[in-house]
């Protein structure tokens, strides 16, 4: 069904998209988002969330995960789980990102996250770009994690899940201080890679990691999309 003519009031709030789709008989509606796309170490995590329209009152503090402090994000994560009809998370390890490229890995993760939801959505909302093969009609929403409740919920689930993984990896690889920078490009992270070399949790297809892995003979061929992505990420701190 073409929803381009669906009216969504500018003051409809964070749940306006979902409510408009449900009114047209297109519920349940799932939101999908990822965390860790821009990191050079650790996994990328994709989450899909279907919110129970009767429990939206539990989500008064819901917002894009990047706008929440770590403490509040953990609390909102619990709120999302209480308000959700279904939640799924897909963890995509660094080796899979190296093998497929970050964009393809992201798309594959989105498809898998939607496919394993306990509730089958009739419509899927994604953040920023369209994704084919989700098993339901879908719509990309620019700045969806700011504007759409189920996408914001997915962003929180993905972020909290990934941060917990990175804190766990910190215990195994304390020299890289993953608990602090979560695998993103920072001066301290680069200094640690320079001193110790990349570990198995680093994405060797990323330019900055490959350059430091080269002396150890670990260089892999780089996809064009990863070269472009990493060029734009040099010196950038966490954004996902």
UniProtKB/Swiss-Prot annotation:
One GO CC term on file: cytoplasm
Query: What protein is this chain from?
Result: Ribonuclease HII
Record bears the keyword DNA damage: no
Which transformation does this protein catalyse, written as a reaction?
Endonucleolytic cleavage to 5'-phosphomonoester
User: Tell me, which GO biological process terms does this entry list?
Assistant: DNA replication, removal of RNA primer; mismatch repair
Residues bound to a divalent metal cation are 33-34, 127
Q: What is its EC number?
A: 3.1.26.4
Stored Gene3D superfamilies:
Ribonuclease H-like superfamily/Ribonuclease H
Give the cofactor note text.
Manganese or magnesium. Binds 1 divalent metal ion per monomer in the absence of substrate. May bind a second metal ion after substrate binding.
Per the entry, which co-factors are needed?
Mn(2+); Mg(2+)
Domain named RNase H type-2 is located at: 27-226
What class does this enzyme belong to in the EC scheme? hydrolase
Name the CDD domains on file: RNase_HII_bacteria_HII_like (cd07182)
PROSITE patterns listed in its UniProt record: RNASE_H_2
Q: What does this protein do?
A: Endonuclease that specifically degrades the RNA of RNA-DNA hybrids.
> What UniProt keywords apply to this chain's record, in alphabetical order?
Cytoplasm, Endonuclease, Hydrolase, Manganese, Metal-binding, Nuclease
